[in-house]
């Protein structure tokens, strides 16, 4: 069980971002992205992390990955990188949360998906501010099936339930669902070409946009 300082002593949020090995990343974009798939996955993750670090109430990002190329790129944008225990997504998140508590025992800890290339820091701040009102909270993805964010107050056990129909799983476990207007960029994860087109309509981060422009034929304008 993760232990942290009381909420009143918290100085902000530490977010844990899991990043797959590039050989396994974004396989549903393979047909459209072709040989650029791995580079696109790195670009999406880097834009996500950079935007999150620009959020005024995010103190640091802990990236969990077993891929050396992804680790180098994400470390370059300011993430603290730790190795992936290779035991699944939620195990990776728990490993990152352990490191987060070690680095900053007074911070709230959250898990943020790595595939939010349109992420806006101000919208993330709205989500984190809302999440801080509850012991544990989560944000569903744009399809209302999965989860893009899960977070806990300092001192609350960190028990993420990502994967598949994780919205229902988090609800069953007692996490509070965050329901706000104006936070589309935090819900818009990208797994398919249609998802990427939807993110493009919101406004992509610079690295992802540059990659899309390189492979534009695979991603027609929205």
From Swiss-Prot:
Which positions in this protein are listed as binding phosphoenolpyruvate?
147, 163, 166
| Assigned protein family | Belongs to the CofC family.
Q: In which pathway does it act?
A: Cofactor biosynthesis; coenzyme F420 biosynthesis
Traced from the root, the source organism's taxonomic lineage reads:
Bacteria, Bacillati, Actinomycetota, Actinomycetes, Streptosporangiales
Q: Which top-level enzyme class is recorded in the Swiss-Prot or TrEMBL entry?
A: transferase
State its role.
Guanylyltransferase that catalyzes the activation of phosphoenolpyruvate (PEP) as enolpyruvoyl-2-diphospho-5'-guanosine, via the condensation of PEP with GTP. It is involved in the biosynthesis of coenzyme F420, a hydride carrier cofactor.
An annotated GO BP: F420-0 metabolic process
Q: Which UniProt keywords apply?
A: GTP-binding, Nucleotide-binding, Nucleotidyltransferase, Transferase
Classification via NCBIfam families:
F420_cofC
Gene3D superfamilies noted in UniProt? Spore Coat Polysaccharide Biosynthesis Protein SpsA, Chain A
Q: What is this protein called?
A: Phosphoenolpyruvate guanylyltransferase
Q: Which reaction does it catalyse?
A: phosphoenolpyruvate + GTP + H(+) = enolpyruvoyl-2-diphospho-5'-guanosine + diphosphate
PANTHER family in alphabetical order? 2-PHOSPHO-L-LACTATE GUANYLYLTRANSFERASE
Q: Tell me a Gene Ontology molecular-function term this record carries.
A: GTP binding
* Record-linked Pfam families: CofC
Q: What is its EC number?
A: 2.7.7.105
């Amino acid at each position: 069980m993760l232990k942290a300082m009381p909420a009143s002593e918290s100085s902000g949020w530490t977010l844990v971002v899991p990043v797959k090995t590039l050989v396994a990343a974004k396989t549903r974009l393979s047909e459209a992205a072709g040989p650029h798939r791995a580079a696109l996955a790195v670009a999406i993750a880097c834009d996500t992390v950079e935007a999150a670090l620009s959020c005024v109430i995010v103190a640091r990002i802990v990236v969990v990955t077993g891929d050396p190329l992804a680790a180098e790129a994400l470390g370059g944008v300011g993430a603290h990188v730790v190795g992936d225990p290779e035991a699944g997504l939620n195990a990776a998140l728990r490993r990152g949360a352990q490191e987060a508590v070690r680095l900053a025992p007074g911070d709230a800890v959250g898990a943020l998906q790595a595939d939010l290339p349109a992420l806006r820091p101000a919208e993330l701040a709205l989500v984190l501010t809302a999440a801080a009102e509850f012991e544990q909270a989560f944000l569903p993805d744009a399809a209302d099936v999965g989860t893009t964010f899960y977070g806990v107050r300092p001192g609350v056990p960190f028990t993420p339930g990502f994967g598949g129909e994780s919205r229902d799983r988090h609800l069953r476990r007692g996490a509070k669902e965050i329901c706000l207007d104006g936070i589309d960029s935090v819900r818009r994860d990208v797994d398919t070409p249609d998802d990427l087109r939807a993110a493009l309509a919101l406004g992509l981060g610079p690295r992802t946009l540059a990659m899309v422009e390189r492979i534009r034929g695979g991603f027609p304008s929205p």
